[in-house]
């Protein structure tokens, strides 16, 4: 994918994206990826730790070891970027990693514990070691909902969103650049279609609406249920423990519930071999994505400059073709298959280093705290 801002620099940027049993790392020089690796961590060793914070030294050690084995030189580093998470709701952008970011991320201030929250701590340690800047870029905690998207039918219950903000915003930034425009000048419906599915509305540089995929909103996905009737959920809840119901949102439903697999390629294979149930499940997911795109287009009052599709499942020509057929009456559909978190993090740092974008300071205050009159 081409870069939207045409940042031509010699900046050296190291990116870190922790997962459950591995940590993805990448080194960029002048906007080009010159090294990348997926650092594996022993699951049995990780299981010995009671918290994310306790994993930090072990993960750092395995990363340093791999870098040394591959003779990767981080001297002259300009910036380190960590994936982020666990922070309180914030506006999108590039944030300096300071003590408050470190505390809130590693202790999951938002109450959602995920290994990606180790990203800022790892990035800061590398940055301090090499005299570089340390940033987080559009973490999953980005929440820029407009007021109309915030209220629900229950007084005091407000919508929040957790979605693939990093990929969504980077896709929009880069596509705007291809159009010869800035992200802040455009309106897009942007989807990330992978293990989780995010559908979002972007107006003039802000993600004004989207589905809370952690909370179960939006289309069905490989392991997620998507939006379902409250009455049906209450009926289903009978005889189930709360912890099991929470798993329902993100772990054990979607493709897994219907077909016993989470790999979209297997679902496509079965459908292609005549499995009518697999075909129905696959097409239903796409149909729900299409409905979500239509809803987000309405949130933009039909003023849509493009419908952008990113994520691993966008490699499927069938998926892209169906969405184009259903939605291209709204705006042109553009496909950017694959995931590019590492590139997105590096691009964010480069924009700040190049003066294209201003770095922000995390306040530790939610971007939404309620309505005065409610």
Describe each region flagged by the PLM.
Residues 65-78, 178-182, 292-305:
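Phosphate/pyrophosphate-binding loops at sites that engage ATP/ADP/AMP, CoA/4′-phosphopantetheine
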Residues 117-125, 136, 151, 156-187, ...:
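Glycine-rich phosphate-binding loop plus the immediately following alpha-helix
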Residues 247-302:
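Adenine-nucleotide phosphate-binding core of ATP-dependent small-molecule kinases
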Residues 337-374:
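Structural signal for terminal/edge beta-strands and the immediately following C-terminal loop/tail
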Residues 67-116, 133, 141-152:
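Short beta-strand-loop/turn "lid" adjacent to the catalytic site in phosphate-handling enzymes
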Residues 13-54:
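Short glycine-rich, Thr/Ser-proximal phosphate-binding strand/loop in the N-terminal lobe
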Residues 317, 321-347:
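Conserved phosphate-binding/catalytic loops in two-lobed NTP-binding clefts
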Residues 304-323:
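Glycine-rich phosphate-binding loops at beta-strand->alpha-helix junctions
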């Amino acid at each position: 994918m081409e870069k939207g801002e045409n940042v031509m620099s010699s900046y050296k940027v190291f990116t870190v994206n922790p997962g459950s049993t591995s940590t993805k790392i990448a080194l960029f020089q002048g906007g080009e990826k010159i090294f990348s690796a997926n650092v594996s961590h022993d699951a049995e060793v990780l299981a010995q730790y009671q918290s994310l914070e306790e994993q930090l030294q072990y993960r750092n050690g395995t990363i340093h070891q791999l870098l040394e084995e591959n003779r990767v030189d981080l001297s002259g580093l300009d910036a380190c970027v960590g994936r982020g998470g666990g922070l309180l709701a914030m506006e999108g952008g590039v944030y300096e990693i300071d003590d408050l970011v470190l505390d809130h991320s590693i202790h999951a201030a938002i109450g959602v514990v995920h290994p990606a929250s180790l990203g800022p701590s790892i990035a800061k340690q590398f940055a301090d070691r090499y005299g570089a800047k340390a940033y987080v870029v559009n973490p999953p905690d980005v929440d820029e909902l407009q007021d109309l998207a915030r209220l629900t039918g229950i007084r005091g219950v407000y919508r929040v969103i957790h979605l693939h903000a990093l990929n969504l915003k980077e896709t929009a930034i880069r596509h705007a650049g291809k159009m010869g425009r800035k992200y802040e000048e455009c309106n897009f419906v942007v989807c990330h279609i992978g293990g989780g599915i995010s559908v979002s509305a972007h107006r003039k540089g802000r993600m004004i609406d989207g589905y809370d995929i952690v909370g179960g909103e939006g289309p069905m996905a490989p392991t997620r249920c998507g939006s379902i009737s409250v009455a049906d959920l209450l009926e289903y809840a009978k005889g189930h423990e709360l912890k099991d119901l929470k798993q329902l949102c993100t772990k054990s439903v979607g493709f897994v519930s219907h077909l016993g697999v989470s790999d979209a390629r297997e679902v496509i294979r079965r459908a292609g071999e005549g499995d009518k149930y697999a075909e129905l499940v696959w097409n239903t997911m796409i149909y729900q994505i299409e409905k979500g795109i239509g809803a987000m287009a309405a949130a933009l009052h039909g003023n849509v400059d493009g419908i952008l599709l990113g994520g691993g499942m966008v490699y499927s020509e069938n998926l892209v073709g169906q969405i184009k057929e259903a939605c291209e009456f709204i705006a042109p559909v553009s496909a950017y298959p694959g995931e590019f978190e590492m590139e997105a993090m590096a691009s964010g740092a480069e924009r700040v280093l190049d003066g294209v974008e201003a770095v922000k300071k995390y306040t530790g205050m939610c971007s939404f705290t309620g309505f005065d009159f409610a």
